[in-house]
Each structure stands twice: as structure tokens, then as C-alpha cells.
Amino acid sequence: MLKKIAFGLLFFLLWVSNLQAQAPFYQGKTIRIVVGFAPGGAVDLWTRAVARYWPKRIPGNPDIVVQNMPGGGTMIAANYVYGVAKPDGLTLGAIAPALYFDQLIGRKEVQFDWTKFTWIGSPEQIDEVLFFRADAPYKTLEDIRKAAEPPRCAATGPASATYYFPKLLEEVFGLKFNIVTGYPGGAEADLAIQKGEMQCRGASSSSFFGREPGRTWVKTGFVRVLIQAGSTRDARAPEAPTIWELMEKEKTPEASRRLAKIVLAAGVFGRPIVGAPGVPPDRIKILRDSFMKAVDDPEFVAEAKKRGWELNPVSGEKLEALAKEVIVQPAEVIERMKRILGK
């Protein structure tokens, strides 16, 4: 009798073990996405939107929670995901697309290797714009060059378009901006412009045109776009020249044009979601595949369109390849990037 009970117990344990082995890894679990900016900015809004449609695309239908960890232009969040979070595919990060700048120039705060993040995907690629309050006395590049007092631009941190786009313009066109960093996110930077504390800021075209207060500001004429980074003019700002047009007009040297291409490659990273290095390959595949399905969900596409967002997803595989490409640059490029980033 005891043998039968023991055999039955063994069979039951093996059966349970087999069921557990067959159950999807993410079943009954919670994925946490750490957003490196404060609530209300473009990265935060995109991440929260994706998080609503992503779980049902992941085998096991896990919960997804979003946590804000602002600071250092997402440096704090990036370091946390890379070096503190377990590489189990349960903690991800939504970080700034240009953090590779900081690694290239050797900032001591960097505790990650850009190429070794687990790249999951991005819901969009971005083009940068630089916009001003309409009552600011700067209508052209020449106005900025001749100004007795440089324009005051709000910025979050060096890895954000709020900072690197005006700094690139300084380097390429010989301009001067008074860039004030430290804003936790785009919402706080916008508030400073609304109050008149700041006169300008860099932004992605999608966040500027696709959410408030940008949409209302454009409609009411409160702001104007001075310059944009896309290869062609955005139809929503047809009067604003592109950086490429201006470089052609001003006969910018080829070395500066190459620098612009490297810096503006950050736009391809878009709104990247990453994991720690060392996530098991099967979980990487699950996360990448499900992410691309989530951003292709008809309901998500409809929501993005309603919000005025430019849905242009980038796969984790493409982000991984781009990360390896941008991180290897010649010494002269790195020296100029140090000037851009103030090191």
C-alpha cells in the first residue's frame, strides 16, 4: 500500500513538474518597464500606451506595470536596468535614444555598454525640431548669431533632443544657446516655455506636433519652428528649413555633415525599450516578436493616429545592429562630440 502511495505521489509530482515546464514563462508574472523620464512626456506616454496592448501578445498574458525613474536624461534608469535589474526579461527600460553619446565621450556616470543592452524595439523613429516662442526675437540663424543675449532653451539632459539638437546647431553653424538642463521631462520644459522662463527647446516632431501643448501652440501661433532635422520639411511646418538645406546653403564642410549624421542617428533609435544584458535568447525572441505585434495591433494603431503620433516601429534586431554601428567612431568625431556635450 505504501509503495502505491509513494508511486502515486511521484507520478503526481512528475505531472505537476511537466505542467510547469509546459506553461509559458511569463504566465502569472509581471513585467516592469522603468521609464527614465517624469510622467507626462513623450517617452512616458508612448510607453504607457504600448503597455496596454502588449500583454495579450505575450504567451502567458503577464501584467505590465510602468514605473518612472527620472534623472540624468534617463542615465539613472539606464544604469539601473543594465547593472541592477536581473537579466530575466521581467525588468525593461524606456530610455533616451542618444545615451550612446555619453559612452562615446567617456562620461564617468555611464555604467553600461550601449551595444550589450537587450534591444526589444521602438514604436517610432523621430525627427527633431527646434521651436521658439513666437514673441522671441529670433527668426533666423543669423538672428541667433548676432544676438547680444543667446536664446534660453529648456532641456532635460544630454541624451535628449532637447539638448543635443541645439548643441549640434551650435557646432555646425557657429551659434550660441543658453541651454538650461535639469528638467525632469518634456512637460516641465514646456511649462517653463509657457511661463516665459525659457524661449525655446528641441523636441521630436512627433511629440511636438502630436500632443499638448504643442498642438495648441502651433494652432494659436504661440510658437514657431525655426529648424527641423528631417530629410524633407514636415508638412506641419512647411516654412521651417531642414538642417540639411541650411548646411547646403551655408556650404558646411563635409566633416560637419558627417557629424550631423552620427548625432541625428539617435532619431532612428526613437523611443527604445531595452533589457539587461544576458536575457535568455528564448525570452528575447518572445519580447521582440510580441512587441512588434503589439505596435501593429489595429486598436493601438487607431489610438496612435487619434493622438497624432507617428507610428514607425523599429525592431529589436535593427536597434541592436545600429547600436553596434554608432558606438565605433573615429577620434576626430569623438572630440567634436565632446564639444557638443560640454566635456
Q: For each predicted feature, which ranges?
A:
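Bacterial N-terminal signal peptides
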Residues: 6-17
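Short beta-strand->loop
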Residues: 113-123, 176-182, 213-266, 315, ...
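Short, well-ordered beta-strand elements
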Residues: 29-38, 64-67, 91-92, 150-155
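Extracytoplasmic "Venus flytrap"
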Residues: 33-48, 70-73, 154-161
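A ligand-binding cleft/hinge motif common to bilobed small-molecule-binding domains
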Residues: 97-109, 163, 167-172, 195, ...
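An extracytoplasmic/periplasmic, membrane-proximal ligand-sensing/linker region
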Residues: 27-29, 219, 248-249, 278-343
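Hinge/capping helix and adjacent helix->loop/strand transition within the periplasmic-binding protein
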Residues: 56-61, 80-91, 99-188, 192-197, ...
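Short helix-initiation/N-cap motifs at beta->coil->alpha
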Residues: 69-77, 180-195, 206-210, 317
